[in-house]
Amino acid sequence: MTLQDYLRDPCGMLSIPYWKAQTVQMPPHIRIVHHRDYDAAAWADWNDEPYFRLMHDLCSIAPAEGPFVCRVAAEAELPLIRELINRSYTDLAVSMKQLQGYRTTPAFAADLWLIALDAQSGEPVGCGIADIDPVAGEGALEWIQVLPEHRRRGAGRFIVNSLLNRMAGRAAFATVSGQVNNITNPEGLYRRCGFTGSDVWHILKKR
């Protein structure tokens, strides 16, 4: 696939950002199929996890508001980023090696690694990681986490809008992906922040 093909319909052409598709080697036990081509009967022997993929044109971005502040995470704060991510999930975990690897990619942007804090207490409430592909002009939200005890206060929207505002003028558009059936409803958060689209990709793993 050429870059020009991808840019005509980013979320409909690939399930991941363009730069990743150029470097990631798909394991043989995994298949990725767009919903338009998906036939449940044909994949009956595979476990299916659907993922939405949405896009933001970065033209109209709400200000980052709420009882929070954010700061750029320093290299020395990678253990804190790891803790915030892992405490936000019950079904996955990231390692220091993974986080360090993210910071060596061609899309790495140091100022898009944010830690969100309660404005009064200074306590970390979550974090956000995004990147920008300078070739495709694509910004991508990679990790958006809010600790369980701080949810339902607007921290997720604060983090997303903080990242989008930092991308404006540097990327032509932004994308994000997440589990369709996640009980925390990440899709709802992203749509409230201005993301649009209807693309769904099925991540299929051989049983």
What are these regions (language model features)?
Residues 91-146:
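A conserved beta-strand-loop-helix scaffold within acyl/acetyltransferase catalytic domains
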Residues 69-81:
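A short beta-loop-alpha structural element at the N-terminal edge
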Residues 9-28, 158-174, 196:
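Conserved acyl-CoA
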Residues 143-148, 152-168, 187-192:
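Conserved acetyl-CoA-binding loop-helix of GNAT-fold acetyltransferases
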Residues 141, 174-178:
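Conserved hydrophobic beta-strand within the GNAT/NAT acetyltransferase core sheet
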Residues 1-66, 202-206:
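Acyl-donor-binding surface of acyltransferase catalytic domains
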Residues 9-10, 14-19, 144-152, 180:
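A short, internal acetyl-CoA/4′-phosphopantetheine-binding micro-motif in the GNAT/acyltransferase core
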Residues 41-43, 186, 190-191, 195:
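Conserved active-site tyrosine of GNAT-family acetyltransferases
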